[in-house]
Amino acid sequence: MRRKLKTVGLILLLLAAPLIFTAQHDREFEWSKQLDIQQSLLRELDLYYVDEIDPGKLIRSGIDHMLKSLDPYTLYIPESRIEDIQLMTTGEYGGIGAMIGQRGDTIFVTEPYEGSPAQKAGLRAGDLIRQVNGRPVSGRKPAEITEEMKGEIGSPVTLTIERPYSGEKLTLNLVREKIKFPNVAHYQTLTDNTGYIRITGFTEGASREVKEALLDLKEQGISSVVLDFRGNPGGLLMEAVEIVNIFVPRGQEVVTTRGKARQWVASYSCRSNPIDTLIPVAVLVNSASASASEIVAGVMQDLDRGVIIGQRTFGKGLVQTTRNLSYKAKLNLTTAKYYIPSGRCIQALDYSNRRPDGSVGNIPDSLTSEFSTKAGRKVRDGGGIIPDIQIKPRTLSALATEMVYQRQFFDFATKFRNLNESILPPGSFHLQETVWKDLPAFLKENNFTYQTASEEALEKLEKVLESEKFLDKSAELVNQIKQVVSGDLNRDLELFRPEITTVLEEEIVSRYYHQSGRARQVIPNDQTIAKAVEILSNQEEYLKLLGK
């Protein structure tokens, strides 16, 4: 019987072989054909197109559009951008540690990093950069200025700056250092029992930084912890696995990857002894939490190891691998999808069903599949991680949004910082009434204009009324509504004073105490953090949410 089965199997294999060979041959022929057509097309363009063609620019445009048709993450990286990839992987570069922006022809500092040569030399947010190493910056692009400020560690840089509102003109002599972006931006105790760790990246060393923060907090007496991954775009897969391993036993499978090539089919498990497998954990996420952030949140949810709080995550469940190309260029391509312990894939079903910020739109349950966590709770695939407790995101009024967009908060904080040497510590600083009263005049001096959401809606209504021939009959009513909803700066500043004051206080604090200070100022007003503390303080509710 076995011999007959083997014979039948061999016959079937022999019959299928020509079909497999033909399919492979057709595929190879199609590739060869298309490459030949492309080469012929480029030759004709070079010979006969009416204007001179930059071959590098043309080919780059073609490559970018070709890869864009696959997914948003498969990218061609020319030699000139290799440093960007190294920065994304290591979080390190040689430079002075300052971000810059541009208004018209003016280059200005948006943020000097805490502890960087820029910060130690006295460079401030809002400072106008006039020269770098004696060379004027006017009319040049920010990317060019940024590259000029980067360089070999230990080499000098001279900046000539102008300080707004104070009239100072300064020459700062700096020495480039290794700039390392921390993955743990901030950590502290929230209550006597609850710690807080904000993780903003997954570059090399992220898991070590989280371990060190957790151990320090445990020494301070915490018995629960909040992990904040909001706004974290992800990074290295292994760092995500190691962060999970801090809270999960050795040997636990964390994630599997599945790709077309056998080499991309793999399983990643916890390899070390954990720090604490019992400490209650709350994981904070939002629509900008992506990739490695989603692995950590998803695994903690699948294993019922922590409560997830916030908004649905971005929905990026793809693995990218960097491959070497000719002339030192590289290709960052999608090689696999990752799957977490329940068996679900976090990747959004398609790239078109997304909101303007890139996050996942509404996906009907009929298009997704149901999975179960370790404790039997129901979870779904196809669109990021849905939190156990959903919190509405912080939103701003049209007035405050326009103030952010036009950098009015930034400029007001710049003026305040350059006229005031010190303020109270983060969490204790509050905007004084005299400072608030300066704001309307400041906005008017800066020619600030805005339109309320109601005004925008009314304008659209007017166009519809006009197109349908109703405007003449309703003109009086429309004008009455317009008088009510039109922006009145003094009125609207008072109406939205609480939120505007909060944003101003956060921006001003960051000028004295940097991003760690901003975090300490933000925390008392953060509803998502408050909810996490509430849940972690109630063991019965915490365990109920985990299905235990």
Tell me the role of every PLM-derived stretch.
Residues 111, 140, 173, 334, ...:
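Short linear motifs in exposed loops
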Residues 22-34, 38, 42-55, 78, ...:
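Cleft-lining beta-strand/loop regions that shape enzyme active-site pockets
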Residues 1-6:
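Positively charged n-region of N-terminal signal peptides that target proteins for export
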